[in-house]
Amino acid sequence: MFTKPKYPTYVLCLLCVLSVPGVGLGGPKDEKEVKEVKNESKDVGKEAERALSAANVLLEITKTPESGIPQDLLNHADAIAVIPNVVKAALGVGGRHGKGIVARRLPNSGWGAPAFIEVSGGSFGLQIGVSVTDVIFVFTNDDGLKGLLDDKVELGGDAGVAAGPVGRSAEAGTNVTFDSPIYSYSRSKGLFAGLALKGTVMTMDGSANRRLYGDKATGRDILFGSSLQAATETKPFVDALNRVAPKGTHEKKAMKTSKK
């Protein structure tokens, strides 16, 4: 005797399909997508942390004008980059590496959208040990940033770099002319000083920039474009720039860049 199924046939078929591993809701594909989203969110969190660390470094080194970056140099900076916690390791042959953030002054004297960068460089010598240093670069013109448009610039090679002047004595000097394209500073164990980092290579952190500004965002788009707004994660750094080098203290002409 034929017994009528308790559930319609299409319901039973659907249950069979959903019971197959990897098919339907909750399968491995969905788990993979969720994992990717979580990893991306974690990475974005790292960018936010990097921007906040850079902001803190910038604010801390300006607390003591007697031993910090001259205010006149900050006011006339075309761009400022901060790389917190640059690690330098040496064991016969050493090297340095760090991740930071850079922003460029706009024609209206405000600060544009920051881009994420990386620095690396080798050092040779019979040193053993590991040191952590905060590094700041002050760009006095757009020439120092041109290499970054091609995603790479070697300091001291592609762009001139010099140890930055320190304190009010440098600012008060009658013959002080900020004629180097880039001035570099370092802070290690609480000590702050100008430091020439020749041989250091600065590149765009493409993966970080794409996460925050979109898959097609380039260094040119972020630093020299007019349509991109600063990512929310970079707000602490922009706020710090507005505090140490506020709007209205600098006049600059818009730079025309050729697209490649």
What are these regions (language model features)?
Residues 2-11:
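Bacterial N-terminal signal peptides that target proteins for export
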Residues 10-20:
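Bacterial N-terminal signal peptides
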Residues 20-26:
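Sec/Tat signal peptide C-region and signal peptidase I cleavage site
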Residues 27-260:
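Small-residue-enriched, tightly packed secondary-structure blocks
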